[in-house]
């Protein structure tokens, strides 16, 4: 009978540890969706999940610059590095924006709830100045969303004298969607927009000059550079491995 006492104590301690671990878990809202216009989550009853450390919410938006956005909204457990820097290129088009927020109390990821969290990515110049170029404009997550029959004709603003068409991928954490776009652009055709350790927009495409010249078919599949380039962590590990082996042999 006495032999069973330590086992009972061990089981009780193990159960207490499980209870303690469970009590330390955070309750975070869980949600992901793609929007093609203004959104408002305030009236929605969002599901919640248990997270080990921190809650997370993020918004990533890409716009033609002519009142046509695609916006990714994601809430859940914090993933990825605990800190990082958002990088942006003021000369890049199409216009984009990302905001990421982490927090450490129950259901605290309820701040980014409406389209008001985003700036106006279709700001018309004041005074209105046209470049003289005219291009097709569209954006969507399917090739058919950017068929010529579904694309608008827009008069381009200011220094946007070229037309652009391309495709790519928008990513927030592990939530990712394809994107297809036609719009106005500058002759430099710079597309590297806002990036961070938690969000990314990878676009490839081409610019042209001429009346409605961005009319080619959207049939080319997008291939991200990350598919052929090893992640940075693996590159660093590959560089450090020979050094670690030498240290181990000399010890």
Curated annotation (Swiss-Prot):
It is found in: Cell membrane. Glycans are attached at residues 120, 174. Residues 135-214 form the UPAR/Ly6 domain. Pfam families: UPAR_LY6. Gene3D superfamilies: CD59. Its main location: membrane. Residues 1-25 form the signal peptide. The keyword Lipoprotein applies. The keyword Kinase does not apply. Residues 226-251 form a propeptide. It is a lipid-anchor; GPI-anchor. Keywords: Cell membrane, Glycoprotein, GPI-anchor, Lipoprotein, Membrane, Signal. A lipid is attached at residue 225 (GPI-anchor amidated alanine). This is Ly6/PLAUR domain-containing protein 5. The lineage of its organism: Eukaryota, Metazoa, Chordata, Craniata, Vertebrata. The gene is LYPD5.
